[in-house]
């Protein structure tokens, strides 16, 4: 049984086995949580991402998929990079967003991670409404068959934390 915990804070400070990065498909860093993870984790993460691009993901990591790299200088063993979908307005299909969580947990199992910190994937510049994103995230984690013992949602601001708190119950 996976325990879900909520934290308001900085995901780059979480002492967990794996930190999930809401990456862009290039895997080369960007803004928001992606940029923060690359900055705090140091060059080892970028180098590992470049190697992945050269060996497996020449066109970039597809939306909804996940892949692990070293965590570099972060207080974790792994960073699991996943590419969330961009909100296209009402009627947007949440399937790819749910896939980000399922695939990240699958990769966590592959690397032996027992504690995983997730951001609120796609709720920043990708504009997914927090209420729906929280519901999709929590449902995907609860429905997942995984050896991960703790999923920690690390929410940057109080409003997002409150929404996730309402969904988790």
Predicted feature locations:
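Glycine-/small-residue-enriched capping loops at alpha/beta junctions
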Residues: 1-110
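Phosphate/ribose-phosphate-bearing ligand recognition and processing surfaces
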Residues: 86-169
């Amino acid at each position: 049984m996976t325990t879900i915990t909520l934290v308001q804070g900085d995901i780059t400070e979480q002492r967990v086995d794996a930190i999930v990065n809401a990456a862009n498909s290039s895997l080369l860093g960007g803004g928001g949580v992606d940029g923060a993870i690359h900055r705090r984790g140091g060059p080892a993460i970028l180098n590992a991402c470049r190697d992945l691009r050269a060996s497996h993901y020449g066109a970039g990591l597809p939306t909804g998929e996940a892949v692990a790299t070293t965590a570099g200088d972060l207080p974790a063993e792994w960073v699991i990079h996943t590419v969330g979908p961009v909100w296209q307005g009402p009627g947007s299909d949440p399937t790819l967003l749910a896939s980000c969580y399922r695939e990240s947990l699958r990769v966590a199992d592959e690397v032996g991670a027992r504690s995983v910190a997730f951001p609120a994937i796609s709720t920043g510049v990708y504009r997914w409404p927090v209420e729906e994103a929280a519901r999709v995230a929590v449902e995907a984690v609860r429905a997942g068959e995984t050896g991960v013992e703790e999923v920690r949602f690390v929410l940057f601001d109080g409003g997002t934390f409150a929404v996730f708190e309402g969904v988790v119950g």
